[in-house]
């Protein structure tokens, strides 16, 4: 009888503890803790690498090869990315730039730091040029394909690149919020 009573008391304590934990988590008001801890003047940046299905890419053709942007966008879609309508010329801000020596240029803002690094893994480590624009709004990653592009990396190569990248550091002037 004493054992049964002890087991009942332990069970009630465990249930009470579980209820308290669930209520504490449910009523947590620290949803913006990361943003609040950014030093004044720093821009919050999402540095966590998302899954491919969470990333939207706009592919531009920086070469003279016909329909290259459409082909690369199709390849990215087959790897789980969402793509905007590909553009067969570089963005206006890059109109005077040569992409002759580039594999790809990846342009992203504070909302897409992790996404930009994820996309870079598809061009192997150090093959793509990463360009962070602190004033850029939105989470779309621009990919400008250069003359040195041959193909996207295989899944194994992507996994190796992601391992080499690790968790991206926040770019200068930003702080990580994830």
Question: How should each PLM-predicted stretch be described?
Answer:
Residues 31-93:
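Extracytoplasmic low-complexity, Pro/Thr/Ser/Ala/Gly-rich segments
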Residues 7-23:
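Hydrophobic membrane-insertion alpha-helices, especially the h-region
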Residues 147-178:
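Extracellularly exposed regions in secreted/surface proteins, prominently low-complexity, repeat-rich
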Residues 1, 8-13, 71-73, 77-150:
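BRCT (BRCA1 C-terminal) domain core and associated BRCT-interaction motifs
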Residues 1-4, 41-44, 170-178:
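Short, charged N-terminal helix-start/capping segments
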Residues 22-32:
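Hydrophobic single-pass membrane-insertion segments
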């Amino acid at each position: 009888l004493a054992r049964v009573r002890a087991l009942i008391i332990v069970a009630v304590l465990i249930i009470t503890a579980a209820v308290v934990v669930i209520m504490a988590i449910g009523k947590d008001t620290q949803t913006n803790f990361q943003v609040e801890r950014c030093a004044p003047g720093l821009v919050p940046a999402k540095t966590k690498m998302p899954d491919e299905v969470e990333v939207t890419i706009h592919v531009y053709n920086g070469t003279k090869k016909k329909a290259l942007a459409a082909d690369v966008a199709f390849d990215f879609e087959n790897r789980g990315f969402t793509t905007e309508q590909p553009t067969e010329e570089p963005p206006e801000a890059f109109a005077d730039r040569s992409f002759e020596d580039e594999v790809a240029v990846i342009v992203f803002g504070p909302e897409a730091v992790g996404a930009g690094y994820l996309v870079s893994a598809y061009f192997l480590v150090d093959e793509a040029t990463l360009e962070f624009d602190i004033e850029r709004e939105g989470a779309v990653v621009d990919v400008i394909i250069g003359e040195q592009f041959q193909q996207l990396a295989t899944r194994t190569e992507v996994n190796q690149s992601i391992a080499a990248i690790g968790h991206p550091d926040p770019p200068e002037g930003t702080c990580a919020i994830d």
